[in-house]
């Protein structure tokens, strides 16, 4: 009897090669998420912190916080989480122990809510044009103004608007438009009644047929004598263009000079006894070298406003003008010299070559019939090739018609972003002693926390 051996062959003893598993791929690196800008409550808390820091830097008391209408203080922790903290109720008691309503506390809470409302208006304008609002504080400082200036420039670029400047530089145009948008924000939220961030006023000029100064008094016609070096370019131009008003004389040092006699100059009534180019301490600082040209410039803006707004009742009696330039826009300290923007009439010599019969637009005819224009400049401008002046100065320069365009563009931006009509409320100009020409500025010390100087 034969025995059969059964041999079990395992699968591992097969002659076939065992397939090797492919190597595992290295783990993919996670893409870094772009740092998102804070939004919502986080953005408002960040702006409130910056505003508080700006107040502290200026030496003003108080702080800005974000608070809900349920009296909850909004804050953000280190991890970026929003925290709502119930406000502590404080009661002010008199000697008898009965609680008294704190008027100051109510006003402060109301101002907090208005500040939040103003911040919402501002973010609507800035976010519509992707403007970085990291420096926005709603205070009249350079950071806040720069935000609104960028919004104006973005609106002009995106709308493909072509703005023609007449005696105006673009920097001043954006500066004034930014001030107007800030003014809309403050007025819409009723944040600071009585404050005028625009720096512009409405002036009842009364210059329909005669010139009036900022005092509201008639300006006095005064002869002006200007002496120039006989070899200078201005002297040669005066001899060539106005030979009847110029002559060569010897001055008190025995040198030959060109004397220009101007009989059409007008000055403030407070400067009648002052020599040419000087102002008294009671003066408003207004002076025109050419009175008839100044009247023509006033007639031009009156006709221009009437053509733009036929139903405007005060188009021929009032005009919008910037009262402050870049030197004193966000400062209450007086300047050495003039305190208000210098008003100068500029003539449009090229307008005389245009045929009026071919023009039907009343806005254009306003300039063709009155080829002169009011230009608002720095309070104390320093001209090229002139000697250094001690006054603070800037390159502020905008014409009356471009100021109208500036307000129109600011209104368009507000309407397209906020969705409602802007609060156009400018104070009417009235003469005050703070507008007087300052001949002397008293020295002022700087802030120092040390007990002794040295």
Swiss-Prot record:
The modification Phosphotyrosine is found at residue 129. InterPro entries: Ad_DBP_C_sf (IPR036367), ADBP_zn-bd_sf (IPR036368), Adenovirus_DNA-bd_a (IPR003176), Adenovirus_DNA-bd_N_sf (IPR036362), Adenovirus_DNA-bd_zn-bd (IPR005376), ADV_DNB2 (IPR037540). The keyword Cell membrane does not apply. HAMAP family: ADV_DNB2 (MF_04054). GO terms for molecular function: DNA binding; zinc ion binding. One of its GO terms (cellular component) is host cell nucleus. This is DNA-binding protein. Belongs to the adenoviridae E2A DNA-binding protein family. It comes from the Viruses. SUPFAM superfamilies: Domain of early E2A DNA-binding protein, ADDBP, Zn-binding domains of ADDBP. Residues 226-260 are annotated as: Flexible loop. Zn(2+) 1 binds at residues 213, 215, 268, 284. Residues 1-41 are annotated as: Disordered.
